């Protein structure tokens, strides 16, 4: 049994210290997801705390056959979607249909060594972050879970309550929407999946 599995089992048995270890282990990816969804550091901090509280309250119902990270990040994404809807963020039209696009969606590498290149990439990351804020809450969750957290289309469908075909359509539309928003200022950077533990944009 892995160390994480031990913490989960102990937390399910009422060990608060074990749950604290889980919080320490996942606080960065949870915060990053909240920040990419909500766009504000203070809101992301509040949402992170709420997500962990909800996980704590429901830990006894967690199925250990399922990856803990997937379960925790799904709770986080759902809370962020609810929070965005309560804020009544502006929504973009989802009427345009399109076929699925398997081309890679590449994000600039935050660990670039060349200083000038790193500066350009930080600017591109800021543009991507700004573009994400223009998406529908569910589309934003789908694209962030897919390309930052490497969720499969099936996992996204299960966690967001969508069909796989709906997930594919939303990802396609979201990619086009992000590219369209980025092109207002500069050529769209190629987007690729990044580890969920990478620094928030």
What are the roles of these predicted feature ranges?
Residues 32, 46-53, 57, 66-78:
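Structural recognition of an alpha-helix C-terminal capping motif at a helix-to-coil junction
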Residues 60-64, 74-95, 121, 173, ...:
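Arg/Lys-rich amphipathic alpha helix in sigma70-family domain 2
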Residues 12-13, 39-40, 50-67, 86-88:
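Sigma70-family region 2
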Residues 126-141, 145-166, 180:
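Helix-turn-helix DNA-binding module
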Residues 2, 101-130:
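Acidic, proline/glycine-rich intrinsically disordered inter-domain spacer in sigma factors
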Residues 12-21, 31-50, 164, 187-188:
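Short, charged helix-capping/linker segments at alpha-helix termini
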Residues 84-107, 119, 189-192:
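Short, basic/polar amphipathic helix motif occurring as a linker/hinge flanking DNA-binding modules
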């Amino acid at each position: 049994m892995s160390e994480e599995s031990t913490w989960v089992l102990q937390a399910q048995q009422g060990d608060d210290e074990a749950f604290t270890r889980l919080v320490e282990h996942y606080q960065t990816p949870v915060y990053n997801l909240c920040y990419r969804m909500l766009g504000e550091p203070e809101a992301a901090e509040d949402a992170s705390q709420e997500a962990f509280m909800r996980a704590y309250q429901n830990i006894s119902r967690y199925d250990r056959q399922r990856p803990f990270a997937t379960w925790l990040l799904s709770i986080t994404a759902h809370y962020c979607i609810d929070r965005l809807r309560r804020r009544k963020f502006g929504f973009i039209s989802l009427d345009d249909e399109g076929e699925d696009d398997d081309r890679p969606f590449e994000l600039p590498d935050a660990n670039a060594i060349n200083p000038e290149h790193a500066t350009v990439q930080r600017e591109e990351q800021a543009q991507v972050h700004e573009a994400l804020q223009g998406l529908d809450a569910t589309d934003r969750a789908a694209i962030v879970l897919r390309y930052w957290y490497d969720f499969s289309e099936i996992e996204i469908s299960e966690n967001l309550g969508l069909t796989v075909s709906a997930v594919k359509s939303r990802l396609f539309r979201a990619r086009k929407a992000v590219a369209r928003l980025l092109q207002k200022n500069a050529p769209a950077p190629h987007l690729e999946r990044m580890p969920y533990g990478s620094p928030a944009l």
